[in-house]
Amino acid sequence: MRVGLVCPYSFDAYGGVQLHVRDLAEELLHRGHHVSVLAPAEDSTPVPDYVVPSGRSVPIPYNGSIARLNFGPVVGARVRRWVEQGAFDLVHLHEPFIPSLSMLALWAADGPVVGTFHTAMERSRGLRAISPVVVPMLEKITGRIAVSAEARRTLVEHLGGDAVVVPNGVYVDKFADAGCDPRWTGTPERPTVAFLGRLDEQRKGLPILAAAVGEVLATVPGARFLVAGRGEATEERALLDRYGDSVTFLGGITDEEKARLFRSADVYVAPQTGGESFGIVLVEAMAGGALVVASDIPAFQAVLDSGSAGRLFRRGDPASLARTLVEALSHRGEAESVRRRARTTVQRYDWSSVTDQILGVYDMVLSTAHAPVREDPRSRTMYGRLRAATERPWA
């Protein structure tokens, strides 16, 4: 099968969607399919051979974060050329309804199209503003996937339609078999708690963790907090400096270091306040053997089976987080029982299972298709029609 994957977000810096697209591409290639990925990337950025860079991206505020996208008539011409030259049996778009490569590809492609929806949000001025333009395009997506119930809810409430839920994937063995790093390995006397996220994004919850550290150390004085991720977080650093070597900032870490961190830490803490549709890092931490302590946002409740495969605390409440961390660090027998349940839970998210489900959607779409993907001639006039809607405030 010839599959064209479109990632809206830049490969210059990996996030959850980029990793999902990369891993799916490599799993499909491993199974013998032909795959081409279209994604924003600078010419100087090293990318896998199967990635076709679409050019420089620009930062756009979106859903409490910064998305790096590219969009416009020049990019649109590149998308049409990629569609025409790819001779794809099927095109699979990620986040097709944000102003990005995916939206351009949806307009450009005529034929079997699958769309995956990753975003979860309560309300969006941008989605409401653009819905008159994009809702008619929904009919072009013959197979719709949402990565979680929250992502499906967002699609249904904002744009109508429906989608089958297929979760994000993780290579479980990669994390389960990673080696421990002695710098990060906890002991009964000095257990380690890991945080990973963009430090300057408030919704990732570092301020919540920073406010809880003192109370945890008052009860578990040997605890060590390992804070990984890019960003300055000046206020939080100043607050945490008072705890000396009980808190270590690791900076940005590689995928290999992330796997070792989750294999080494006793607890992984996810204090996000919202804007998460799934929680892929929770699954990675569970696969690595860390006990997950997470805020009780809907996406995290789903991943942790309502607290059976991890521990939940009240969102945005440092005192609740501190109490939950103290319990996790103090009751080691109970924590090990939770870890055992988590090891079973994560198997449903392994790429071997997730790819089977995605291929099932592909088969359904292709069973009703009358021709492979080709360029939609109407796409040559699309930019003018989209421009007015997409230049409005987004999210």
Cite the ranges covered by each PLM segment.
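A short, well-ordered alpha-helix in the C-terminal region of glycosyltransferases
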Residues: S320, E327, E334-R348, G360, ...
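Glycosyltransferase donor-sugar binding loop
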Residues: A41-E42, L196, G222-R237
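Conserved donor-binding/catalytic core segment of Leloir-type glycosyltransferases
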Residues: W184-K204, A210-G214, L226
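Carbohydrate-associated surface elements
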Residues: A41, E150, G169
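Conserved acidic donor-binding segment of nucleotide-sugar-dependent glycosyltransferases
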Residues: S306-G307, R311-P318, E327-G333
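Short hydrophobic beta-strand element within catalytic cores of glycosyltransferases
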Residues: L291-A294
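Acidic anion/phosphate-binding donor-loop and adjacent secondary structure
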Residues: R125, V170-E189, R237
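Nucleotide-activated donor-binding/catalytic signature segment of Leloir-type glycosyltransferases, i.e.
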Residues: E236-R260
